[in-house]
């Protein structure tokens, strides 16, 4: 069947670190990473320009470490290194399925990755390469959600795809705890902030709103969902400035 034109031509996919851990929930499961890489490769083969930001929660969490007494700045830098580990593993899996991939880091580590340079990242995308952004924004106190929103703005992405584990969108309550929870199909960025819906942290939400970047929250565990989102199927929750506010 002939595909329609894509809704989004340049996307930034935000993956949690836990997405790479598989059923174990911690560490890196190579088979899981390879499965995700194949999903991304399928979309990339259709001519979609793709960047990635991957969290580091499968390897390290800075806030609990800080609460236990570790210096918060050092804890956050440790987490940034975790995101680079995840980026390198994902890059290898993408290379193995035939996708030319570059890792760029906000903290210089030129033996393993390029430094983040916006112009170079744009050229990679234009040449059909996938770019993975590691090490957050290079500063403590900023989440990888904020990294995703900032890098999406810098590369002029059409949308941020928030790939969730087993969660098919945004609800007014936790659907695992409340059977009456209702899923939102559409929201404005202002809705998200005003309703306190923690899709991403407030800094990331504001960045997305101010730069008019669509945000799509969807379940990544179902095969083909990334492609469905790119081609405009309403399978999750779309957050945009251009949707009439919901009551």
From Swiss-Prot:
It comes from the Bacteria. GO terms for biological process: 'de novo' CTP biosynthetic process; UDP biosynthetic process. This is Uridylate kinase. PANTHER family: URIDYLATE KINASE (PTHR42833), URIDYLATE KINASE PUMPKIN, CHLOROPLASTIC (PTHR42833:SF4). Catalyzes the reversible phosphorylation of UMP to UDP. Keywords: Allosteric enzyme, ATP-binding, Cytoplasm, Kinase, Nucleotide-binding, Pyrimidine biosynthesis, Transferase. Pathway: Pyrimidine metabolism; CTP biosynthesis via de novo pathway; UDP from UMP (UMPK route): step 1/1. ATP binds at residues 14-17, 57, 61, 165, 171, 174. GO terms for cellular component: cytoplasm. The gene is pyrH. UMP binds at residues 56, 76, 137-144. One of its GO terms (molecular function) is UMP kinase activity. It is found in: Cytoplasm. CDD domains: AAK_UMPK-PyrH-Ec. Pfam families: AA_kinase. Allosterically activated by GTP. Inhibited by UTP. It catalyses: UMP + ATP = UDP + ADP. Its EC number is 2.7.4.22.
